[in-house]
Amino acid sequence: MQLFKERRVLTVSALTALVRGLLEENFEQVWVEGEISNLACPQSGHCYFTLKDAGAQIRCVMFRGAFRSLKFTPRDGMRILTRGRLTLFEPRGEYQLVADYLEPQGIGGLQMAFIQLKEKLAKEGLFSELHKIEIPKLPRRIGIVTSPTGAAIRDILTVLNRRFTNVELLISPVRVQGEGAAREIADAIDDLNRVGNIDVMIVGRGGGSLEDLWAFNEEVVARAIHRSKVPVISAVGHEIDFTIADFVADLRAATPSAAAELVVASKKELTAEVEALSHRLHVSQQRRLERSRALVTALSRAITDPSRVLGHLAQRVDSLDARLVREAGLILDDASERIVTLTARLSRQTPALTLKRWEERLATLSLRLDHAMTRRLACAAESVGLATGTLNAVSPLATLSRGYSITRKLPARSVVTSSRQLAPGDRVEVSFAAGSALCTVEQASRESDSLTAPPRSV
């Protein structure tokens, strides 16, 4: 009885609350590695998955705020390292891990996010050369998107001042790292597009770690560069650094200084090129002037001696006159010969000759037709005579004329060919060569029997 009195009875809810308190107090932050399975991310924005290894598994949840801060997209089968706290989900009595950080095993989370976004944008065609805009050779107005206090802007300005000072710069200051930097960069690109009269745009920053450069790996920056109507030069980090912005931009520069060198030509180089063009123009003008002088000299000679010009013209007139006479004679000869030929052909093809030939052909054909019809009628008459003789030979009328008769059994009028078809009392019709008679059968004998006339009564 004493033992029963000291028993402490707990409800399920109370026990669950105690266990939850113990878990949350002793496992406030733990690091767990395993493989993701049963990943589900509903519209609420929270993410649910199971973390497992060969011997066990644990349910995990990552709430919307923490999930949105991930730089990569978790997938089933991915091995990860996660940080979180243990708690108990009281409605089901299951303990679970509330994760606030995920990192892929074997590769950093940022690197994984870089690879995933690069593959996604490549499939959409954002890196295609078809979307690249040509960089102008002599821009008058250049837009720059970078930090106003970083080394990148100083390098760009130094190179531009050294190479070509006659260019207008429009600087859009932004943060180039940290939270919100990517959004600022994208907005600055859009703003410079709205300003108008911008010939080319440099977007970049100096070197740094992958985390420092990450703003230029964000999707929002990539899409802003892609939709820009102004050609964009990406100049992020050092030569070995590559960002998503580099792949989307119309041109990639290894450094901000290199971007400045690409966007404008050196003033010395332009001066040398102008001098070379001036020299070529001078040489061309000199040659043209020399040709004009030679032409003037030749014309001057002709003008100073008109008789020479008239002599040449008279000689050419004589030559053309002789040629005209010769060509006219040839043309007339050809025409005469053609007239003779056509006259001969016409005489052979007069309507009278043609009509005569057709009359002769008609007479010949008529004669042939008469002969053919005569032969055909003679053959037909002979065939009719033969058929008539044959028909008379087999005609029943011819047989009847020789004393024979045809007997038909009534009432069907079927021809009787044997005495077996008849019986005493049958009515028959006997046809002769002239007329017929109705008779009654009194006796029918077999072929070998002879008929006996019935006795007559006197």
Curated annotation (Swiss-Prot):
Cytoplasm keyword on record: yes
Keyword Nucleotide-binding: no
GO cellular component: cytoplasm; exodeoxyribonuclease VII complex
E.C. numbers: 3.1.11.6
GO molecular function: exodeoxyribonuclease VII activity; nucleic acid binding
Subcellular location: Cytoplasm
Catalytic activity annotation: Exonucleolytic cleavage in either 5'- to 3'- or 3'- to 5'-direction to yield nucleoside 5'-phosphates
Pfam hit, one: tRNA_anti_2
Single GO BP term: DNA catabolic process
The organism's place on the tree of life at top rank: Bacteria
InterPro entries named among the record's database cross-references: Exonuc_VII_L, Exonuc_VII_lsu_C, OB-fold_nuc-bd_dom
Alphabetical UniProt keywords: Cytoplasm, Exonuclease, Hydrolase, Nuclease
PANTHER family: EXODEOXYRIBONUCLEASE 7 LARGE SUBUNIT
The family this protein is said to belong to: Belongs to the XseA family.
Record function comment: Bidirectionally degrades single-stranded DNA into large acid-insoluble oligonucleotides, which are then degraded further into small acid-soluble oligonucleotides.
Quaternary structure annotation from Swiss-Prot or TrEMBL: Heterooligomer composed of large and small subunits.
Name by which UniProt lists this protein: Exodeoxyribonuclease 7 large subunit
Organism of this sequence: Geobacter sp. (strain M21)
